[in-house]
């Protein structure tokens, strides 16, 4: 979204697993992950930080390198979203609230379509419904 806000002009965009808070509060979300990484090993079982740390242990080779990426994460002002008029698919798992509300994000974009698929933030990426939602939407653009 930051590239779109800075003037990138693709024919269309797909935002998967993203909600309104993740876009307009992106910098805050980045700070949350930095805090989680810096406190690794100390989070009580069952907390969001513990779950995120467990995922990170399985998928990230160098957590400290991720901190540098997260420090560059920026928020996008809500009013900027209203200027992004390209066709956009917002697709998200039915149980995914990780980055806020995907339907609210779709409503904030003037030319967006919302598609709900089964799953949560990480589980929905393994569902064939994600690929099918993107294929169907892209086919409808032609």
What are these model-derived regions, one by one?
Residues 112-142:
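Catalytic active-site module of serine/aspartate enzymes centered on a nucleophile-bearing elbow/loop
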Residues 2, 79-80, 101-104:
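A short acidic, amphipathic alpha-helical/loop segment
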Residues 80-85, 107-109:
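Short, conserved loop/helix-junction motifs that constitute active-site signature segments
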Residues 94-120:
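Conserved loop-alpha-helix segment in the C-terminal half of the alpha/beta-hydrolase fold
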Residues 53-76:
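Hydrophobic, aromatic-rich cap/lid helix
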């Amino acid at each position: 979204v930051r590239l779109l806000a800075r003037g990138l002009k693709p024919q269309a965009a797909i935002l998967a697993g993203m909600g309104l808070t993740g876009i307009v509060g992106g910098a805050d979300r980045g700070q949350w992950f930095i805090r989680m990484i810096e406190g690794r090993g100390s989070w009580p079982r069952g907390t969001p930080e513990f779950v995120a740390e467990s995922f990170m242990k399985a998928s990230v080779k160098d957590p400290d390198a991720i901190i540098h990426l997260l420090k560059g994460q920026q928020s996008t002002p809500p009013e900027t979203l209203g200027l992004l008029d390209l066709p956009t698919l917002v697709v998200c798992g039915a149980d995914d609230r990780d980055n806020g509300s995907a339907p609210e994000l779709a409503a904030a974009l003037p030319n967006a379509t919302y598609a709900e698929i089964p799953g949560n933030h990480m589980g929905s990426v393994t569902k064939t419904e994600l690929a099918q939602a993107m294929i169907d939407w892209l086919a409808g653009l032609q």
